[in-house]
Amino acid sequence: MAEHNGGGNPSARQTAAEAWHDYWKWDRVRWGTHRVNCYPGSCPFRVYAKDGRVIREEIACNIPQIIDPEYRAPDYNPRGCQKGYQHSRAMYGAERLLYPMKRKGERGSGSWERITWDQAFDEIGAKLADIIQSHGPQSIIIDQGTNGAGVLRGGGEGAGAGLATQLGGVSLDLNFSIGDFLPGQYLTFGQFQQCPGVENWFLADTVLVYGNPVYACISDYHYVLEARYRGSKVVQISPDKSPSAQFADMWLPVNWSSDPALWLGLCRILIDKGWIDFEFIKEQTDLPVLVRKDDGRFLREADLKEGGDAEQFYVIDAATGKLEALAKGTLQMECDRVLEGTVEVRLKDGTRVEAVTVFTLLRKRVAEYTPERVYEIAGVHPDQLEKLAEWCRPPRRIFFFSAAFPGKMYHGDLCERGACYVLALTGNVGKAGTGSHGWSAGAEFNAGSGFVGSMPPEILESDDPIGGALNTTQKLQEAYKTMFAMDPTMPVLEAAQGMLREGMKTTGTLSPPALFWYYHAGYKDVWDKHLEDPNAPRKISAYVEEAVANGWLQGYDMLAKEGSNPKALFVSGGNPLRRTRGGMNTYVRTVWPKLDLIVVMDPRWSTTALHADYALPAASFYEYADTKFSCPNTRFSNFTDESVPMRGESKSDRQIIHGILRATTAELKKRGIKSYTAGPREIDVDKIMWRATYGNKYGDSNADEERLVDDAYRALGEVGWFTSLDGEKLDLANLRKNGGSWLSGRPTFPAMVAQNADMVAGEVFWCFRDQVEQKVPYVTTTRRIEFYLDHPWFIEADEHLVRYKQPPYIGGHQPMRLTSGHLRWSIHSNWVTAEEMLKLHRGEPFAFINSAVASGRGIADHDYIRVFNDYGNFMVRAKLTECVRPDQLVIYHAWEPYQYPNWMPYDGLLPGPVKGLHFAGGYRHYQYMLWNWSPAQEDRHTSIDIEKAAFQG
């Protein structure tokens, strides 16, 4: 055999061997992770560098094993995916933004000039001073994304939040910008941010799967596969045979938006056969609670006597047949409750009405959904439905993986509520191997500039402003119970939510993006025109106007007020021209001409950056020390160290924002402006930088910022929110030693309080233990799991109980429906143009189309097709498959618009209407707060048609 690279020459062979060995040598190795929203992420890496350049990374299996004394589960290691494995190449890719850039030509023309940081800061500061002086600070809009979300030095909810806090601008709530709110769980439990550990999936006997976790949860899905080895059944519910369906024991190919019929048919079988947990539903749910027959509202004490409590509800005492007040401060039952029954009551005006239990109404509702009708509506055969009921029969443990799509589908709330019905009826809440999940993060953000920078002066003047801010949250919760609500029976979570809600109102810096879209981005007319819902009693505009008029968004409605006039847009860690439905259609055409200033901070050239006035290079993940947000799903907080210096002239997001703040304050002072009004606040110009630097304690140098990380984690450890992996003191040195820390205990940030359970390092974790074990109430109107929604809007729409509703027509009456999901080769648009990822697929956007349909329309594999509806159109490559429905087109999200012909992505034909009911307010848990309860754009099942395109590429 011939010798490779040198034939028979020994010296040549030695040179090749030496070169190969030299390739695997490095100068330094550091801990690393990737601060993107690949939730839950938490993937630890070792990063290898040589000659000032990162040469590779590999998964570090340093997450301690689960050693729960009661529940055995596989450990987390290894955690990682192909996106993380190639970042060492992507950070040197052609799309990397390395220098401050200023637009020369028209926006989006591609004409740029390189400028210095001083010029960028001075020009942006002068323009911001103009805007503050002429239009007010609330005309500055901050769009925070999730990429680059370093807790203390990164973008998005990290340092990015400080820009709104200090200048008085308006930050758009990122959870509704990206559409990851889960309305069905929120309506049922009063919260959606409960996040059991991913190891909890392994303990389930039946796993109900929405979405496509094989693509979206690469690091976690092994728990589902391992659960099958112990006999668990996996049920995939999706209209197409997704990649996740091949690993399921049962695939239910449901018709469009027909999931509520499936769940109600399942509930019917469970109830008729007595396969429900009677004690659980009596104690934990509203099923025994009485509802007035005349108006469909809960029976309240205020109905029965003058001055009665409007939040005191009733059940029927099974022993006496009389009314019994439902306890507020505990779930402990004061008597045995009647589940199915009717009682006549005398109202305060002397009239008599009948009241009926919610369970009675539920039985009537589910009776409509016979197996035959479910088959007709949903396409699920009666035999499958019966088998599913057997797999959900108590005492089997059921876990519901909802993914993130319910918040992106018009009737996704009904779909999700239906699944929650099944969980509650069978008692599958608050126990190991049961429940559902949302997403949760944020314990570390209480050490960030958005929170600490808003603290009272005495805290910022102290020696430990971060520790002072963290300790303040607990005091504020107790104060909210007494001073604000005057209700000592209030659950801790409700107090935490109230504290955050009222606190953020006082800053005037947060708004639901729906108000921005509706009042300023052109969607008011688009939504009313391109949404046709035969079951909706009103147009979207009617819901918006009533909600605003009723003051349901008071304190967050600055963008709905007369005179509101956005003039500047800052984008940190986001990409709104890609992410917003209709982004390259209505959004850019309407918003861009209104803006005097558009600034994007990003490590790469995104579509939004290419349409900005200034593109500022943010440092990448391996270039400075910080951590990624932690979450209860893994309880592991990853640390990323500086493996190499920041590339080019890039800076941390915190350094960029401080440069902008410093230049803006200098310009304001030059003009003699000492203070200005920002909503409810008065901004002292002299104090802007003082607050941003926590009382001038942390400057902008790398050493200063590392000291900030050090002090923040020391403080987080001292309050017990995080613990080190080795039991030693938590600080930067410990993070550098171990690569991370444990999220633990009960952090008082509301998204953490929502777990309703202690987080113990190394133990299996599940949520709602407080409710099941300690009888702590839920944070709903009745303080129980709510099957019934008695808000007038939901009663009017006949959604007080779950029901099937046909999907609306979005975009027209075309014969096909468009669906989407998370792309396998990127995290949102991060890495979507990375060379290594492009090698793993066709290298450009493509859409899955049914092979038979394509053949009938003369479309071959890889042809360009034109996809269109009444709102817009785009072109994309066709990828033929038998795995999608004949009336379906599947295109995964996150391709950059500039990867499509004419820069028009699939979002260009998505009018993205919101569901008007989600503007409901005025009740205990129908109140907006950060990340919770607001409409998001709905895009799943948009109406489309296709044809072969003449475009050749």
State each model region's role.
Residues 94-119, 123, 268, 273-382, ...:
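N-terminal leader/propeptide and maturation segments of large enzyme subunits in energy/redox metabolism
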Residues 143-151, 373-380, 403-411, 442-443, ...:
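Conserved short loop/turn motifs at secondary-structure junctions
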Residues 1-341, 372, 458-505, 512, ...:
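N-terminal export/assembly segments and adjacent metallocofactor-ligating motifs
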Residues 243, 607-640:
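Flexible glycine/proline-rich, aromatic-decorated loop/lid segments
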Residues 155-235, 338-346, 358-364, 376, ...:
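Extended redox/cofactor-interaction regions of prokaryotic respiratory oxidoreductases
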